[in-house]
Amino acid sequence: MAISSSSSSICFNPTRFHTARHISSPSRLFPVTSFSPRSLRFSDRRSLLSSSASRLRLSPLCVRDSRAAEVTQRSWEDSVLKSETPVLVEFYTSWCGPCRMVHRIIDEIAGDYAGKLNCYLLNADNDLPVAEEYEIKAVPVVLLFKNGEKRESIMGTMPKEFYISAIERVLNS
């Protein structure tokens, strides 16, 4: 995951937070710089992590604000159906791992197409009626709208170029 240092980034050092030292496995958000826990046997990891003398050294973390806005059932009509600008909506759930990968792609697209395309995220668990209306049975799903009509749908995690080609088809139609 490439971390950008744009003006909308918020950087903080996770070692300032007490919960940061209780990480049980490495993640992309908290890169471990002193050792690789994946190379340790499970018993070694458990004793290492339970030892109060051991401290994981964590590198600073940068988190960028999302460029895609949240849309809800209340704002759906005004934001999506009545929009004069073409709209991209990602349907996701909070527990969906692949949705996080699509979030990053949609975020990049929102920056690349600012002014030409409005990008939104809709939590399908929280706004089930909208998801049911568009027959969303699994997530992630990306729908593209133009003049209030659904023009394209993309199911699953795809490369950025796949989304770009669908967007270009909608913009040129």
UniProtKB/Swiss-Prot annotation:
The record marks 97-98 as: Contributes to redox potential value. The active site is at residues 96, 99. Disulfide bonds join 96-99. The keyword RNA-binding does not apply. Residues 68-173 form the Thioredoxin domain. Belongs to the thioredoxin family. Plant M-type subfamily. PANTHER family: GEO12009P1, THIOREDOXIN M3, CHLOROPLASTIC. This is Thioredoxin M3, chloroplastic. It comes from Arabidopsis thaliana (Mouse-ear cress).
